[in-house]
Amino acid sequence: MFEKPVVKTFQYGNHTVTLETGVMARQATAAVMATMDDTAVFVSVVGKKEAVVGQDFFPLTVNYQERTYAAGKIPGGFFKREGRPSEGETLIARLIDRPIRPLFPDGFTNEVQVIATVVSVNPDVQPDIISMIGTSAALAISGLPFNGPIGAARVGHIDGQLVLNPSEKELKQSRLDLVVAGTDNAVLMVESEAQILTEEEMLAAVVFGHDQQQAVIKAINEFAAEVATPAWEWVAPAENTELKAKVAALAETRLVEAYQITEKMARYDRIHEISAEVTAALLAENEALDTKEIHTIFHDLEKTVVRRSIIAGNPRIDGREKDMVRALDVRTGVLPRTHGSALFTRGETQALVTATLGTQRDAQIIDELTGEKKDHFLLHYNFPPYCVGETGFVGSPKRREIGHGRLAKRGIAAVMPSPEEFPYTVRVVSEITESNGSSSMASVCGSSLALMDAGVPIKASVAGIAMGLVKEENDFVVLSDILGDEDHLGDMDFKVAGTATGVTALQMDIKIEGITKEIMQIALNQAKGARLHILSVMDQAISAARSDISEFAPRIHTMKISVEKIKDVIGKGGAVIRQLTEETGTTIEIEDDGTIKIAATDGDQAKEAIRRIQEITAEVEVGVIYTGKVARLADFGAFVTILPGKDGLVHISQIADKRVEKVSDYLTEGQEVQVKVLEIDRQGRVRLSMKEAVETSDAAAAEVAPQAE
């Protein structure tokens, strides 16, 4: 029934990788089962043979989905099936998309969909790298006009050594988690998080990852040669040179003038005017012309005008030199009731960032294929339409917002205190209120400021900067603090976050080949200069965490009890701890090692909760006099509660120093009495005496009396 499947197996570092096609999804354009040491991802590619007429963009969709059966689990929830993509799935979909998108040719507008499904998971091998390798292999055998294949590698930094594709266990000891993807001669994408490494160490990791992944590219080329799928008969649309010349004649000089306008919205208005005038003039001349084609040519001309000006060494769109950072404005404590807040403005990009402190109970529980984990540091990024002067849908976060939020979080994570140092869950929210490039890096700066304003003891201030590149043949210019237009019209988007001493996050997206190690080195060094400048301005506003947290934030008090006493504090069915939290107005969390964390906005409430827990966990001591409450009467004596949950028996013979006929003649339930602990037997039963408590008290009073005279 099946033709002989094509299987390619190769060694990749410590892992064995297998690529297989020809058995499953034979109606798809291409499909590959990619396996790396029992982690298997099934990748399908479908490309439409016909493009939508008049479409001027490339409709590539990448879906990444994790199936719980891959880890031998059944999904939770009422419906017991997978739902919408998780944040982790969205981030990996972006990771696959970013390096493959620039490898499709300009003018190719056929719809392409990539679906990567995780079908088996080895907990020690993350599925992202093998998903990227599987996607590359599927595209390589699809026949689509794809200028690949790409390789992918994860790089760790352990004990001063670079490690290829570290295991989950190794990653916990690593100072670096870097993913790099590229072709045989170019790096295309970098995504990383680091524990404050130098620029040289980061660059070495990128180069190492790119060198190591050549084994993947070689194997995929051999795999594709064996499959031998015929290439699509796709020809790039012919360039309309006549229309191009007409648009240039009408618009070029005016566009050069328009790009002298430094204010973003005024510049956009002028460019739209020119576009409308050029379109109207050309349609008046020939009604048969395609408006979309005119707009595409006009946009290409814009790109040419800006790039040519930058390469020529002219001032940038907003009048800056290549290595200048826009004007900065830094404010902290801008919102009265939040736990921490900051407003960070860089040129026409602005972020309002808040920090909120919560208890361990507020931590996010993340249910991954490899197991459940808790995240005590959350960072959310919002990009509302008004920040770019537009109207639009406001709802759940889009892929871009999730990606930018994760990048900002990576930038800050290295300086966050450990849960032992600061036992709070921290949520940072960045609201982008204005945007003209590099809003994710503004979020990094604003987050650092808001955390310090909230009193979170972060290790150092963190700033982020976005770099750009314009390259024409052998000439290139690296730009610091790029505008949105420079990002859109340039060849590289290169974001670096870090402290004064090193890098905490690096993200690179490169649209062209030929970005050398030297160019990346120049960009990293230029980024360092810009970062240090921004940090100096931030430090003038706030250079260290405030000595105390906000009066509106919960204060967490920590105490330790014996592990055996945990059950006493919780009580049967949680009755004791529930009563404690309700009556004291606090939040109480108990850990397995006996650590108790009490959170309260009022200090007196916390003190009361601590006092009551100390009472519950206190040990009864022989010879000590306690003030107790009569809990129950019996014919042979009375049971008295001397500590919460601890009763003892006062035998009828120990109630008074004379004969007692009836217990109820001397005691009533609820009565407070003083009792002395006589004995605790092997079974933990407590024997009490009222008469000895009176005798001891009288003796103590007699000793004190002479001194009183």
From Swiss-Prot:
Would the keyword Repeat turn up in this protein's UniProt record?
no
In terms of one coarse class, where is the protein primarily found? cytoplasm
Instruction: Quote the subcellular location field of this record.
Output: Cytoplasm
Query: Where does the KH domain start and stop, copy by copy?
Result: 554-613
Asked if Glycosyltransferase is a keyword of the record, the answer is no
Under catalytic activity, the entry for this protein gives: RNA(n+1) + phosphate = RNA(n) + a ribonucleoside 5'-diphosphate
Example of a GO biological process term = mRNA catabolic process
Q: What one GO molecular function would you report for this record?
A: magnesium ion binding
- Supply the alphabetized keyword list: Cytoplasm, Magnesium, Metal-binding, Nucleotidyltransferase, RNA-binding, Transferase
Q: Where does Mg(2+) bind?
A: 487, 493
Q: Which SUPFAM superfamilies match?
A: Eukaryotic type KH-domain (KH-domain type I), Nucleic acid-binding proteins, Ribonuclease PH domain 2-like, Ribosomal protein S5 domain 2-like
| Summary of subunit composition and partner proteins | Component of the RNA degradosome, which is a multiprotein complex involved in RNA processing and mRNA degradation.
Q: What does this protein do?
A: Involved in mRNA degradation. Catalyzes the phosphorolysis of single-stranded polyribonucleotides processively in the 3'- to 5'-direction.
Q: What is this protein called?
A: Polyribonucleotide nucleotidyltransferase
List the top taxonomic levels of the source.
Answer: Bacteria, Pseudomonadati, Pseudomonadota, Gammaproteobacteria, Vibrionales
This chain is encoded by the gene named: pnp
